[in-house]
Amino acid sequence: MSLPGLNFSTTETNTTESTHTIDLKPETEWRYEVAIGGTLHVTLKSGTAEIFGTELPPNKELSIQGKGSIYTWQGCQFVYTAIAGPKGLMSDYTTEDTPHMTMAINLHFALEKMRNEAEQKPKDVAGPRVLIAGPPNSGKTSLAKILLAYATKCDRKPIYISLDPTSVNLGPPGGVHAVQITDLLDVETYGGFGSSEISGPQKLQPLILLSKYFGLEKTTDNFKLFKRSVAQLAVPVLSKLAHDVEAQKSGLIIDTPRVPGNQNKTIEVNLLTDVVSDFGVNVIVVIGNDRLYADLMKKYPVGASGPTVVKVPAFACMDDDESYNRDAQQQEIQQYFYGDAKDMKLGPRIVTVDFSTLHVYKIKPSTQFDDDKADMLERVAEANILPNTVLTVMHAVPGSSEKEILDSEVQGYLHVTEVDEEKNKVKILTPVPGRLPSQVMLLGDTRYHE
């Protein structure tokens, strides 16, 4: 049996295929798609190659998950083996159609020029603050990774902003995140960025995340709350830039959320203009969307004050699909609690707590609002809706106002495994032993089934 459109066999599991050798000509790319639960083992034998801008070390095996590509500027040879997961092996192909890489490195050089110019000016003059916009599957995150990786090669320390609440590049879904990139991106993690300190000791510098929780799957499910979450994330980011000259000159790379194609385009433009205002964006990169580019050019015409808007061709990448994204979210939650498949095993704990001691609030879609002043949170009165949910622990105390809860930072995540309605008890999977760090939690759309 095969998964539709992916050509993955689902009958073989946990088997190792023979080793394959790939020879890439200069400026060519090998694209791969590993089924969720599978692993690709790659060793660079000669030449140079990179995964989204991060160079592969020679003669060292890397364990890779998800979708991506290996690109070479000068030619290379590598070997790989694939270990099947529960949904099969992988698909792969080589292509010489790689104009996106030339575009990416030219864009990097332009941003680096802006950084050099900013360094010659007063410390409050910002380096490039780049917003990457485009439709789903246009390659926004791929381009962001390349720009971040190339910046670190120049000893820069840019801040990456992820505004897609469905993404699992930096942790479980539902949040918007900011993280300063101070080391190589870790291509062995699922998202390709790295792991946070919660995962234990790291081979590379751990990511120190700043997160605000949105909780719903679509930005348009509660546009008011999403814009609030982004604005609240911008406050500490701008404070960091104001007090850290190195970060100020290195700048920002902002990865914008996906907006469904059937949504009113005015919504997307309004969202992007809010992000521009919140973070002081001075460069907008539009990927493969003439209409969005035209709309933004009307907002920010050439010669006027405001960001520079540039359009680049669609970035080559593997298409996403709903089933794959769902599986990826489940895998990321599993790895958050249990560690990755290679060498980072974690020991989560099950704790039983009285539901009456918890302050769990459900995030309401905007369709439930009676007016603009309506509450966005609703206290969960019964525990029976909690099995298989993921609760987001907030840096707040019982009795906090809705504003205080929504403005607080994310401390971590818990998984409700079981509810005893008669005793009003809940069993919770926690990533670390000991007491819960907070009793104030938010319930969004994310579910997890072990």
Swiss-Prot record:
Gene3D superfamilies: Clp1, DNA binding domain, P-loop containing nucleotide triphosphate hydrolases, Pre-mRNA cleavage complex subunit Clp1, C-terminal domain. SUPFAM superfamilies: P-loop containing nucleoside triphosphate hydrolases. Keywords: ATP-binding, mRNA processing, Nucleotide-binding, Nucleus. GO terms for biological process: mRNA 3'-end processing; tRNA splicing, via endonucleolytic cleavage and ligation. ATP binds at residues 29, 67, 137-142. InterPro entries: Clp1, Clp1/Grc3, Clp1_C, Clp1_C_sf, Clp1_N, Clp1_N_sf, CLP1_P, P-loop_NTPase. The keyword Nucleus applies. It is found in: Nucleus. The keyword ATP-binding applies. GO terms for molecular function: ATP binding; polynucleotide 5'-hydroxyl-kinase activity. GO terms for cellular component: mRNA cleavage factor complex; nucleus. Pfam families: Clp1, CLP1_N, CLP1_P. Belongs to the Clp1 family. Clp1 subfamily. Required for endonucleolytic cleavage during polyadenylation-dependent pre-mRNA 3'-end formation. Component of a pre-mRNA cleavage factor complex. Interacts directly with PCF11. This is mRNA cleavage and polyadenylation factor CLP1.
